[in-house]
């Protein structure tokens, strides 16, 4: 798969995506990296530790998050993207579901859009932007309720809907990654199930990204707070690797 100018053999060589939240209120690390110097130092540390992609996020998407304006989100992420591009030779993913933010991010140098609403957010213009910019896109499963008739099959069907949106806009298959959306539109049992059956996403024909890092499902299972979820993160990441996932989005 090509992400910007970078080529990855994801089928044979899975990679780590390092999380860089430049937000004051992310569930796990809000406020830690929301200035340029701290963000660059953390980026350097993650690359040293093996991250092959840096995922920049300017708005928390934790449960109960506060929606911010496009302008505020752009003001958070664009300077960071520009500085990372100046200082490091690494592809940048932008974690946003807003087309205006994504456009500004791509213009600043982002190589990939990580869309937690799977191209289904209200403006419905994200797919057109991805098609025109040729950026890679991670299509995540999400919904605003936890009602399913046949859970795993429903997740696959809803991801197919997102993929259809991408195709209709002219997005190429070579640009697409899919994500089961652990922690999004799912209750505790459903999160456990989608991790268990994450290999089913391979049926869609795209690389699979798995993001379980520090998620509440780990905290509930092990009865630990967000600062003590490393063991659960490692365990679920290993499960994902064994089930064919190609990209692992992690804090550590």
Give the residues covered by each predicted segment:
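Catalytic-pocket segment enriched in acidic/His residues
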Residues: 24
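Active-site-adjacent loop and "lid" segments of alpha/beta metabolic enzymes
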Residues: 3, 11, 28-42, 61-79, ...
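Catalytic domains of carbohydrate-active enzymes, especially glycoside hydrolases
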Residues: 41-57, 244
């Amino acid at each position: 798969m090509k992400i910007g100018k970078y080529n990855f053999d994801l089928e044979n060589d899975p990679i780590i995506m390092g999380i860089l939240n430049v937000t004051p209120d992310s569930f796990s690390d809000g406020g830690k990296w929301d200035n340029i110097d701290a963000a660059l130092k953390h980026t350097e540390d993650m690359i040293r530790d093996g991250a092959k992609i840096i995922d920049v996020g300017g708005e928390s998407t934790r449960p109960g998050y506060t929606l911010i304006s496009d302008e505020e989100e752009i003001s958070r992420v664009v300077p960071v993207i520009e500085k990372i591009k100046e200082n490091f030779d690494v592809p940048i993913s932008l974690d946003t579901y807003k087309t205006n933010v994504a456009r500004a991010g791509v213009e600043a140098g982002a190589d990939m859009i990580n869309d937690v609403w799977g191209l289904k957010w209200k403006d419905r213009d994200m797919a057109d932007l991805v098609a025109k910019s040729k950026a890679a896109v991670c299509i995540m499963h999400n919904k605003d309720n936890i009602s399913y008739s046949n859970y795993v099959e429903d997740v696959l069907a809803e991801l197919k809907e997102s993929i259809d949106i991408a195709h209709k806009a002219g997005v190429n298959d070579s640009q697409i990654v899919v994500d089961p959306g652990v922690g999004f539109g799912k209750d505790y049992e459903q999160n456990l199930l989608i991790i268990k059956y994450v290999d089913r996403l391979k049926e869609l024909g795209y690389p699979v990204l798995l993001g379980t890092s520090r998620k509440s499902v780990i905290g509930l299972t092990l009865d630990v707070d967000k600062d003590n979820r490393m063991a659960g993160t490692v365990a679920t990441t290993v499960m994902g690797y064994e089930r064919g996932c190609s990209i692992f989005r992690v804090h550590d």
